[in-house]
Amino acid sequence: MSTSRPSQSSSNSGRSRRSARAMALATVDAKLHATFEESGSSFDYSSSVRISGTADGVNQPRHDKVTTAYLHHMQKGKMIQPFGCLLALDEKTCKVIAYSENAPEMLTMVSHAVPSVGDHPALGIGTDIKTLFTAPSASALQKALGFAEVLLLNPVLIHCKTSGKPFYAIIHRVTGSMIIDFEPVKPYEVPMTAAGALQSYKLAAKAITRLQSLPSGSMERLCDTMVQEVFELTGYDRVMAYKFHEDDHGEVIAEITKPGLEPYLGLHYPATDIPQASRFLFMKNKVRMIVDCHAKHVRVLQDEKLPFDLTLCGSTLRAPHSCHAQYMANMDSIASLVMAVVVNDNEEDGDTDAIQPQKRKRLWGLVVCHNTTPRFVPFPLRYACEFLAQVFAIHVNKEIELEYQIIEKNILRTQTLLCDLVMRDAPLGIVSESPNIMDLVKCDGAALIYKNKVWRLGVTPSESQIREIAFWLSEYHMDSTGFSTDSLSDAGFPSALSLGDVVCGMAAVRVTAKDVVFWFRSHTAAEIRWGGAKHEAGEKDDGRRMHPRSSFKVFLDVVKARSLPWKEYEIDAMHSLQLILRNAFKDTESMDLNTKAINTRLSDLKIEGMQELEAVTSEIVRLIETATVPILAVDVDGLVNGWNIKIAELTGLPVGEAMGKHLLTLVEDSSTDRVKKMLNLALLGEEEKNVQFEIKTHGSKMDSGPISLVVNACASRDLRDNVVGVCFVAHDITAQKNVMDKFTRIEGDYKAIVQNRNPLIPPIFGTDEFGWCCEWNPAMTKLTGWKREEVMDKMLLGELFGTHMAACRLKNQEAFVNLGVVLNKAMTGLETEKVPFGFFARNGKYVECLLSVSKKLDVEGLVTGVFCFLQLASPELQQALHIQRLSEQTALKRLNALSYMKRQIRNPLCGIIFSRKMLEGTALGTEQKQLLRTSAQCQQQLSKILDDSDLDSIIDGYLDLEMAEFTLHEVLVTSLSQVMTKSNGKSIRIVNDVAEQIVMETLYGDSLRLQQVLADFLLISINFTPNGGQVVVAGTLTKEQLGKSVHLVKLELSITHGGSGVPEALLNQMFGNNGLESEEGISLLISRKLLKLMNGDVRYLREAGKSAFILSAELAAAHNLKG
């Protein structure tokens, strides 16, 4: 896939490319499936994938009828696996609207008895489900069907009325109906006596604890641990972790097997092996089990009167499609269990607002279990596996974020070094020194074309081939300043075959019209190794069969002309270097002078920065000393060098006595090890949060006992980033701990404490062993707005705390999973630490707090539920967070309003452009044609301004100018037309005093930006000219010869106006000396920055009775001046 990429990256463009790739692959999947169905046993896997794979190039397959039929077949299949049965109910009447053919036998027949009408109820369309099960079972089903988050109640244990057989009922909703899968409870299995997610979570407690105990920083270790835990939990012969790469192909990155099985670790397989439709289903139904791929499927019969086809996407019984079943059989995998690993999409728009809770998700990979014999895993264990996969996904997400941070840090470091090289030896330092451009991104080679010379590094095409690529880019991608592709062949480069396998992928950025930087990559297959790829002697050629070895061979064939795809952050890094080089190339001749000026300016900034730093430091010290929360600090030796008024007040130890004492001598003996560990980690730069310890009291405070603190450690660093001490910001939780200690000492009646309205009693809620709410104290009612009677006997996970219709809505799915983990730990008797927790109260306010969970024991010491304690932030912190959220919301509202206005302006602008084009097709006079040309220039200027979404990039000088030929006459006429209405209203006369020889000169530059600048300065001049006054535009143009045919044009325009002139405050804003307080100030600053991009500037001169803007810019002459 080739991509001609604009110079600025965007998450939306990344998502749209993925979307387009997914649609293209879905069409390839559809054609493969159609070929498979037509070919039957003669299906040739390898050749079919290769033929279909050729579509994944420039000519992407279209979304046709074959694709639509295939997607319908995948989502609306009417077959299930025979290990259970299925009923579909009308949600309003609870009557059967569809059933599997084996349902009557499984649910209504009496074992070893001849069926008759009298001894069992009939099952068919319209049957009332309550007639099929015992009264308690029917009641349990009825309750579950009325539950909003019904998935959280699965599985529901029910018993058939006729046979008494136990089944797990697994319920989910689809449009207009409820689907119930019935799975028999095996004789050897101890059935779960109560529904609820917490019951299933208990089964994965050990695995979750192991995952959470892993140190971060190794994706390999995380995946190896996951497959090991799933292997032990489920008992399958093989467990693998798949990862999907950016081009959608898959790789086995972790594996564990029973002895004697062929290893698949390192296997790569084409994207088509797991179709896009299947990936979509994995996003919806995150655990998928196939008990026996050879088993005969069972048909589902539905009411013919139904106006829609039932979808079985969410059914646990959904039968595998024929091609997948054959693939499994070919690799001797009879049974499988698959868990989806769903993570946050990294290309999000950085939204951290609590009002926007849901992030875009993507399928990162799968955890796949295979067995060589039929294998059934009960639903409770599968539910536990799903929960484990969610916890695993959270850790994968953290590892991905950590990897990106490390990569970005390395790129920034390399960019800084390259920038330094450019400053010292522009531009050849980036290829002649170390590090060089190859160190910026992962590549096999790089090249630079500068002043018609070629410099090469690493594995690259020959010099003549590089020149040919540069010519091809200028011919076929001239509108793009950047280009990237993982296959030069697919991108259309004519001589791609001559490059061979050595160079397949390329990225390039154009610094100037003729100067280009290239990066090259070899084919992907060069980096791929798999132990299972070897063909064993005596084996028949299996290239035609669907098998991992065939998949690997096909994958290598597909990627032999492709490199690893270029990632978004790599393209961004190249673009940043492009901007650095663009400025460096302009300034090469005067580099020494610029370097001195920059160094002088940096020295000035350092002096100013130190003064500001001292002022800020003094203010921070004052805030720490007067803070209402305890704050203390120590040096690298652990000696106290900071002790604020609050902690002195709590401990009774004055500041003077605390200073110089070792911290470990001030804490209780029971907390020494914990504080020592926290201190050592902080001195290494690892900052722990929410650490609880006790500190001694002194003097008059000794009788009240030690103070309990929850502390966040923060490493103090010097200007060289060395750790020089540790600062501890604490919360006093003594009152809460006293309550909890007193609570734990009481055996039996706890209501006197929990239900006490004393403000010292924290918010407390609790659940029984099945996850139903059994406690909700007055403080909790006050905090959430929900009364005790409204929440009692509701499911804590889902009904009270959840992501959709819950009473207290959580921010996202990750928060929901983390809450489940904490409750699960306490329920299994493990000690839990305080964790950050947040939810939306009834009034919509977002509450942030710390959650502490304690197990509840009966007289025999068995866990009968949990108690949850919430610790709220101090009022000062809550106020600060509230102000921060308000500021973010205000900024977001303004941004939304601006986006709305820009979008609404475009529609009428398109109408104006259409009207103008229609007029151009009519008979017009010379003057009318000139007016239309002026109108067109104004419209183009407006469109360009509407595209300026990032003012900071303009202010910082990171804007690409669009160069083209133009005459100054066009610019002057268009600019003047924009201010004529204003000048006529004030009776101001505008005089164009620019010589005709100058205005008719053909120049080369960005005419629309020059037009924007001139119009802005004209408007400001008219605004500050008295009524009846005069504004005069004059200009000069000088040329310098840079070569035989190239002339540099220095243009200077003056705008002179009468009156007292532009206010000094507004001019200060133009020069960036004051904050941007007005629209005129922003306009002037942007205009000046645009002139600076044209190697120009603006001056403002005052004389008696008149003032003038002097605008300068450097352009190029398209041809020599006449005369």
Swiss-Prot record:
Annotated organism of origin: Glycine max (Soybean)
UniProt-annotated binding residues for phytochromobilin: C323
Gene3D superfamilies: 3.30.450.270, 3.30.450.40, Histidine kinase-like ATPase, C-terminal domain (3.30.565.10), PAS domain (3.30.450.20)
Highest taxon of source: Eukaryota
Subunit (UniProt): Heterodimer between subunit A and subunit B.
Protein name according to UniProt: Phytochrome A-2
Low complexity composition-biased segments: 1-14
SUPFAM superfamilies from the UniProt entry: ATPase domain of HSP90 chaperone/DNA topoisomerase II/histidine kinase (SSF55874), GAF domain-like (SSF55781), PYP-like sensor domain (PAS domain) (SSF55785)
Function: Regulatory photoreceptor which exists in two forms that are reversibly interconvertible by light: the Pr form that absorbs maximally in the red region of the spectrum and the Pfr form that absorbs maximally in the far-red region. Photoconversion of Pr to Pfr induces an array of morphogenic responses, whereas reconversion of Pfr to Pr cancels the induction of those responses. Pfr controls the expression of a number of nuclear genes including those encoding the small subunit of ribulose-bisphosphate carboxylase, chlorophyll A/B binding protein, protochlorophyllide reductase, rRNA, etc.
Domain Histidine kinase: 900-1119
Post-translational modification as stated in the protein's UniProt record: Contains one covalently linked phytochromobilin chromophore.
GO biological process: detection of visible light; protein-phycocyanobilin linkage; red, far-red light phototransduction; regulation of DNA-templated transcription
GAF domain location: 267-449
The family this protein is said to belong to: Belongs to the phytochrome family.
InterPro entries: GAF (IPR003018), GAF-like_dom_sf (IPR029016), HATPase_C_sf (IPR036890), His_kinase_dom (IPR005467), HisK_dim/P_dom (IPR003661), PAS (IPR000014), PAS-assoc_C (IPR000700), PAS-like_dom_sf (IPR035965)
Domain annotation PAS: ranges: 616-686, 749-823
